[in-house]
Amino acid sequence: MDPLLVIRNAEAGSADEESLERALTVLRRHTSVEVQATADPGELDGVLHRAGSRRIVVAGGDGSLHAVVSALYRRGELKDRTLGLLPLGTGNDFARSVGMPLDAEEAALALAGGTPEPMDLIVDEVGRVVVNNVHVGAGAKAAQRGARWKSRLGKAGVGKLGYPIGAAITAWNPPLLRLRVEVDGVPVVDFDEQVLQVAVGNGRSVGGGTELTPHADPGDGMLDVMVSRATGPISRFIYAARLGMGTHPSAVDVDYVRGRQVSVSGEEFWCSADGELDGPERHRSWRLERAAYSLVVPRT
């Protein structure tokens, strides 16, 4: 097994630290392991510069994986890399999509005995990458509102209530947008209809297991695009229930298509890309970059 460089978030909590130590104990039975903690993009870039030929392992959740993949992409080094992933924390949606165990020790065993598989990547019109999923509309608005409440409530030590409050406010008063969504140049929805949510998925789930694009596979060379036109109060309730079960793609007011290029334009909207908020926007586009890097996944 190649020597490993494990990159972790310097601000990880004590529970994550304990999980990581258990995983490192397993990995050190197989190879040499160095651990580096990074707190900002500058530190991460320095660690990557010194990585050499060691296999890089990301210890963290979707945000940590996004940060490392994005930095390697900017450096022009992603294509030649095989990465590993040790899921930590509570989200880990991309890990779920590729079948990585969420238990730290089991993930370390899978990493030690796994096989590299090519992974696709979403790249936007200015060259920024998305590893897992980008969505527009209700989910992004909930995240935006939740971030505001998290900031306010964090001063009282209850910042974790921010997102549920943001989601509740959005469910009561969601953004209904007039958008034109095109997939490979073909319109899926146009300005004559209101849209509740648009999702472009490389991975299946968001928010710690909600399968927003349940048929997505990050290695199949296609993007899954979901457009919800559930704009009435009752239809929104039904959509939310079906979303929880992963059956929403078959609903009459949901379009679920696949392609390699996606564009969204129209009224001002916000995007949530791998959990990072961006906006307001009038036009965004994304394309698939096939087999952009390799990731070690469990043997099947």
Task: Report residues per predicted region.
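ATP/NTP phosphate-donor binding region
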Residues: 1-59, 66, 71, 105
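Catalytic core of DAGKc-family lipid kinases
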Residues: 5-8, 17, 21, 35-38, ...
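Short beta-strand/turn micro-motifs composed of small residues
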Residues: 7-8, 60, 229, 266
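Glycine-rich beta-strand-to-loop/alpha-helix junction loops that act as flexible
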Residues: 10, 59-61, 86-88, 202
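Short N-terminal binding/cap micro-motifs at the start of the first secondary-structure element
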Residues: 13-17, 207, 295
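Short glycine-/acidic-enriched loop or helix-start segments at secondary-structure transitions
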Residues: 16-17, 67-69, 95-96, 141, ...
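Glycine-rich phosphate/pyrophosphate-binding beta-alpha loops
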Residues: 135, 139, 199-214, 277
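ATP/nucleoside-binding phosphotransfer catalytic cores, i.e., glycine-rich phosphate-binding loops
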Residues: 183-190, 211, 217-300
